[in-house]
Regions:
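Conserved small-domain helix->loop->beta segment predominantly found in fold-type I
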Residues: 1-60
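PLP-dependent enzyme catalytic core of the Aspartate aminotransferase-like
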Residues: 49, 54-174
Length: 175
């Protein structure tokens, strides 16, 4: 949330929901019964098919759960539609499904309208460099063992002379 910020999270959520809508519409048009009426990223579908390469949750013998996330691609959705319906999904079909899914979003009345993640920390660190600086700043605030107790725990090692350490390099001790 710190890296993506409120705008990034909304973008990710909208994309995942859109892909889920495309999947639902493609499955419906392919004859697969979608049991989930209101969904965000997860669908329950009536099928006993397991798709190789995908981890479908077995809800029952005839129902599978399909969850999408920000790593899901258009190709993944097309592959799922093809595997579960037996119909190939080309780019034109996919774009048609996208347009149809956008018109029938089941969550339109549940969309949040108020501001989210309003604290400045969620609105300032949106590059890798800024994020690393922020994490380093947090690390510097932390009182850790490497800043406080290390001197007590390692004083015996510090006092060992180099000549005293030579025997640990002998093959008799190292193998």
């Amino acid at each position: 949330a710190v890296y993506h910020g409120p705008t990034g999270l909304r973008t990710i959520a909208a994309r995942v929901h859109r892909l889920t809508g495309i999947l639902a519409e493609g499955l419906r048009q392919g004859g697969v019964k979608v049991l989930t009426a209101r969904y965000f990223d997860t669908l329950h579908v009536e099928t006993d098919t397991d798709v190789p390469g995908f981890n479908l949750r077995r809800v029952s013998a005839t129902v599978r759960g399909i969850s999408l996330n920000e790593k899901t691609t258009r190709a993944d959705v097309a592959c799922l539609i093809e595997a579960l319906t037996g119909k190939a999904t080309d780019i034109a079909t996919f774009n048609t499904l996208d347009a149809q899914a956008a018109k029938s979003s089941p969550l339109a009345d549940l969309l949040r309208s108020d501001a989210i993640l309003t604290h400045p920390v969620f609105n300032t660190h949106h590059t890798e460099h800024a994020m690393l600086r922020y994490l380093k700043k947090l690390q510097n605030k932390d009182l850790a063992l490497d800043h406080s107790m290390i001197s007590l725990g390692s004083c015996t090692m510090k006092l060992n002379a180099t000549s005293e350490m030579i025997p640990i390099t002998w093959p008799e001790f190292s193998d």
